[in-house]
Amino acid sequence: MHIPTAAPAPAKPLPIYRQLYFQVIVAIVLGAILGHYEPLVGEKMKPLGDAFINLVKMIIAPVIFLTIVTGIASMTHLRTVGRVFAKAMAYFLFFSTLALIVGMIVAHVVQPGAGMNINPAELDQTAVHSYVEKSHDLTLVGFLMDIIPKTLVSAFVDGNILQVLFIAVLFGIALASVGEKGKPILNFLEALVAPVFKLVHILMKAAPIGAFGAIAFTIGKYGVGSLVNLAWLVGSFYLTAFLFVAVILGVVCRLCGFSVFKLARYLKAELLLVLGTSSSESALPSLMEKMERAGCSKSVVGLVVPTGYSFNLDGTNIYMTLAALFIAQATNTELTLGHQIALLLVAMLSSKGAAGVTGAGFITLAATLAVVPEVPVAGMALILGVDRFMSECRSLTNFIGNAVATVVVSRWEGALDRNRLQLALDGRESELPPPIDVVPEALPAKG
């Protein structure tokens, strides 16, 4: 392991027009203008956004596999893997449940659907039929069985994050178990990390094009005008998500010695990319690299980030309970405390079953309402038109939640370089030396 003898000279910052976050901002603005004034042309820009997301998905599996395998194989005690995973899952379960409760509380306070007096029988259910059909496949057993791939190769071919995670953990444990015999393979995989992340950097140069196409399509197809009728619901959701991040996650960050706002600033390029593409997956490889650069252990990053993308969906959870109670209020459906507790419990399970599913938020909502028959599934037609505009906020909240979780779990494990984190969050990335991985078991575990 190379340890630098002196800090490198600070690199000259790039001009603003060459920085990714600025390019993405310009692309989003131009895409919105095109979609608004030339909606038919804007709709035709959809392939640009789809192509970029597919490019990123192409590299996600290798990034996850290499990060997890090299991280686990470098651990001297395999029980550390189980400890990190257990702490991560405990964090995910607590804050995912808290997000569901927050969405429910806000729905009661704001009452976004009150006074609409909608008759569910008069709603057009054909538009939501396909989502309801997909929701029938979301069962806990089916979700658990889907984690196991049919072959070692199929997980990479299908791009299933959980399956790649499963294979990587097993292979990393096996590689660590064989000791010195596995060293050549570990060295090869560690050498492979550099070109793979270089490829990520190359692909990210296309981010402005992808963001332009995705936002032009959204505005062109759905129009800003579709927000007016349900602006109270959309506004309530955005405000709730912001308060969840600023207050709840903000307190967690403060207790761990850093600011959630500085973390968001550090990840501004990734957040803008998520905003433009409405997909948190589009920034997954870059998030993993940046969290490691900010002082989080490679092994913790490799376990927490991919797992969090399936189990730590704070934004989706807020949306589910808020939208469900909005539908109940709009259709004058009375829900007892027992009904609402049942809704909460079902949402806890169904939100885990939609990992990696396109349109996961809407599909999990359909799955939840199907199990809690008191809320009419037909009421989903009310929010179908504005769901796309809430998708960006869901993705942004999910993304920030996973970034916070990575730092918190790293700190719990004593696997966080706080000096690197402070430099990164203060915007002094040019002063950062090459990352030196902190192996969790080398330090006393905390928490």
Curated annotation (Swiss-Prot):
Domain of life of the organism encoding this protein: Bacteria
One family name in Pfam for this protein: SDF
GO MF entry, a single one: succinate transmembrane transporter activity
Coiled-coil ranges from the UniProt annotation: none
InterPro entries tied to this protein: C4_dicarb_transport, Na-dicarboxylate_symporter, Na-dicarboxylate_symporter_CS, Na:dicarbo_symporter_sf
Gene3D superfamilies: Sodium:dicarboxylate symporter (1.10.3860.10)
Main location as per UniProt: membrane
GO CC annotation: plasma membrane
Location in the cell: Cell inner membrane
Record-linked SUPFAM superfamilies: Proton glutamate symport protein
GO biological process: L-aspartate transmembrane transport
Xref: PANTHER family: AEROBIC C4-DICARBOXYLATE TRANSPORT PROTEIN, PROTON/GLUTAMATE-ASPARTATE SYMPORTER
Protein function: Responsible for the transport of dicarboxylates such as succinate, fumarate, and malate from the periplasm across the membrane.
Family note: Belongs to the dicarboxylate/amino acid:cation symporter (DAACS) (TC 2.A.23) family.
UniProt protein name: C4-dicarboxylate transport protein
Species this protein is from: Stenotrophomonas maltophilia (strain R551-3)
Lineage: Bacteria, Pseudomonadati, Pseudomonadota, Gammaproteobacteria, Lysobacterales
